[in-house]
Swiss-Prot record:
Probable toxin from a worm-hunter cone snail. Shows an excitatory activity on a majority of mouse lumbar dorsal root ganglion (DRG) neurons. Very probably inhibits the inactivation of voltage-gated sodium channels (Nav). Residues 1-4 form a propeptide. Expressed by the venom duct. Disulfide bonds join 6-23, 13-27, 22-31. This is Delta-conotoxin AtVIA. It comes from Conus ateralbus (Cone snail). Keywords: Cleavage on pair of basic residues, Disulfide bond, Ion channel impairing toxin, Knottin, Neurotoxin, Pyrrolidone carboxylic acid, Secreted, Toxin, Voltage-gated sodium channel impairing toxin.
Amino acid sequence: LSKKQCGADGQFCFLPGLGLNCCSGLCLIVCVPT
């Protein structure tokens, strides 16, 4: 899984291969690669 960091809250998110960047594993907030 590609580990990235969310720009807003600074938490980590993962790219589960579904074309979505998920923050906190909730897949509700789009993360930006930092």
